[in-house]
Structures are given as structure tokens and as C-alpha cells.
Amino acid sequence: MSITIILIFSILSFLLGIILSYVKYIFPIKKNSIIAEVDDLLPQSQCAQCGYSGCYPYAKAIVKNNENIDKCIPGGNNLKFKIAKVLNIKNIKYSLDNLNAKNEKNIHTTVLIDEKNCVGCSKCASFCPVDAIIGTPNFMHTVLQKFCTGCNICLLHCPTNCIKIIKE
């Protein structure tokens, strides 16, 4: 009795899977190619420094709501020019609040972990969206400055407040 029920549900699941995959090709979800192109340019760090929950919502806001293209701090000025090229924007205004436009450089951040207070819980490393924090549990962790975007997410999850961010 139980084998027949399992067999019936297995066959039913298989048939529904085939139907769903067939429906996917008949009614494809059409994505805006411009949004996808802008999203591909963004660094995908999901750091939320732009005020959006991730890179795709920010790309969607840029294309649909004419959001400023200079809010992505990890992307820097080069990203701003690439997005402007995709959107055919001719006059780009520099935003000195978010980017260091005069030197064509990103605002650099240095993240320091205090060795005395770090307990090696690895919470900062597990929440880092760009994997810039390395270390093993119960030992001191370190930050790879080259990859750190300064998003402050590690600060929120550190139980001992041993992480300091210095913006230069």
C-alpha cells in the first residue's frame, strides 16, 4: 500500500516538473535588457551603501526612476562613466559627497581589527559580502584591504566591537 502511494506521488511529481519546465519556455519572463546591463556593471557586493538592498534594485532604480548614477561607492568614478555610456548620458555631474571626482579615485577605507578584543567568532567573515575578511574560528581575523568596500556590515555583526573603519 505505501509503495503504491510513493510511486503515485513520484510519477505525479515527475509529470508536474515536466509541465513546469515546458511552461517556462512557453511563457518566458522578459527582463529589461538595460537593467540587466547596468546590473552587470555594478560590483555585486550587495553592500547597500547606495541606499538600496542590493545591486539589482539599484540598477532598476537607475533605469526606471532616473536615480543618480553616482551612489555606488565601491564602483567608483569608472563605474559612473560606464553606466552613463550604457544610458547615453552626455553631461555627468561629479558628486563630491560620494566620490573623490577631482582625483578620479575611490574614497579609500582602511578596516582595522583590534587583536586584543577579537575572539575569533568569524561572524564578521561570514557576513562580509565580498569575502574581504579571512581567518579561522577562535583565531585572529584579518581584512584584505584590496577587496574591502567599507560597507560597515562587519561592524554590525561583531559582538566585541573590535572592528574600526577609517575613511581616507
Swiss-Prot record:
It comes from the Bacteria. Its EC number is 7.-.-.-. Residues 1-24 are annotated as: Hydrophobic. PROSITE patterns: 4FE4S (PS51656), 4FE4S_FER_1 (PS00198), 4FE4S_FER_2 (PS51379). Binds 3 [4Fe-4S] clusters. SUPFAM superfamilies: 4Fe-4S ferredoxins. Residues 30-89 form the 4Fe-4S domain. It holds the Pfam family Fer4_21. [4Fe-4S] cluster 3 binds at C128, C148, C151, C154. [4Fe-4S] cluster 2 binds at C118, C121, C124, C158. GO terms for cellular component: plasma membrane. Part of a membrane-bound complex that couples electron transfer with translocation of ions across the membrane. The complex is composed of six subunits: RnfA, RnfB, RnfC, RnfD, RnfE and RnfG. This is Ion-translocating oxidoreductase complex subunit B.
